[in-house]
Amino acid sequence: LANGARGFRYDTAKHIGLPSDPIDSAVVKAGGSNDFWDIATGRKAIRDISLLLPADSLFIYGEVLQDRNIPEKEYAEYMDLTASNYGHVLRNVLNSHNYYADSLDNWHHSVSPERLVTWVESHDTYCNDNESAGMTDDQIRQGWVFLAARQNGTPLFFSRPMGSSRENFWGNNRLGDRGNDEFKHPEVIAVNKFRRAMSGKPETIYANTDGSVIEVTRGASGAALINISEHEQEISMPTTMPDGNYTDGVHNATFNVTDGIIRGRLSGMSSYILMN
């Protein structure tokens, strides 16, 4: 913190005990307790040393992968939590090319969405049994646009290995190399800027009839249109955007809004960011 760090990720956080967990009798006799998280987040000092800055001024989240009997709400008293189940649901939708294939309108977590860390895939889903490694970069990117355009959740972008492909998941596989170029794809840059511009604006999510196109609107201020199919789609669907013509800055495509209906064409596996 003295050198400028303003946040922490606690790996495998769910394997570190909470105050409600059982305590070894020897620890009890010595006056100890399950106080790791109280110390780590500055609630309790140890040998008169405590966190340099208040925890609520930092971004702290724990890798608490979801499973049965995980006390998520107790962990959330100390930190934000990973929404691993939501990532699974999103990948299911992307692989099905259909918004209605699963329930993206539900965060699948017991903690409020503003306390969640989201992802399309993580290092675990990419590396462990290659659960998500077979998905194309285009699919992952459209999933990212969806997450980043949303009002809640703090999305994380997993940077796949440089030189990787769907035939060679590991790519160059050199220690210290940065990931591939997807993190600076124009669609990723556009939605990242959109996210900052839309901070605090309420969201509404729509999908067209066959679920191939998802729209995330942020009040009357902006909208993200995402084609999760591999084919061009012509849309006519509800929106909260005011009447007018809007041009996407990445593809230079124009969409028209009249009487609460947005119309236009989207290329396969592509996204369009519109701002008022």
List each model region and its residues.
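Active-site-proximal helices and loops of the catalytic beta/alpha 8
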Residues: A2-N276
